[in-house]
Amino acid sequence: REGFSGMARWMQKQSAEEIGHAYAIAEYMIKREATPKVDKVDVVPQGWGNPVEVFEHALEHEKHVSKLIDELVQVASEEKDNATQNFLWQFVREQVEEEANVLNIVSRLRKAGDSAILFIDAKLGERES
């Protein structure tokens, strides 16, 4: 809505990736004779003051997801469920990358300030996957 089409494209790609992760987890659960259940999803804010705030929010969310995955690994470990631990480690590694990517964007946006935000927008719009 604010004209940052590159950032919007980046977020759309990110969203599609996260949906893929949800499907992977559901498929794994079915293989293990568990029933996937989607509960209510927290309401996402509908507006921010500027793009930095958007990506700061995304960074906090990635940290939250990392914590949840870590907790699942811990439960699997306590249950001596090696298969699930192995499955979850891919997400542990993924979260390290996710947090680093978003932190990098936040850092760049903070350093660039308003004068270079359109350049960063264009760069984010180049994301392929």
Regions found by a protein language model. Give the residues of each.
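Iron-associated oxidoreductase/ferritin-like identity signal
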Residues: 1-129
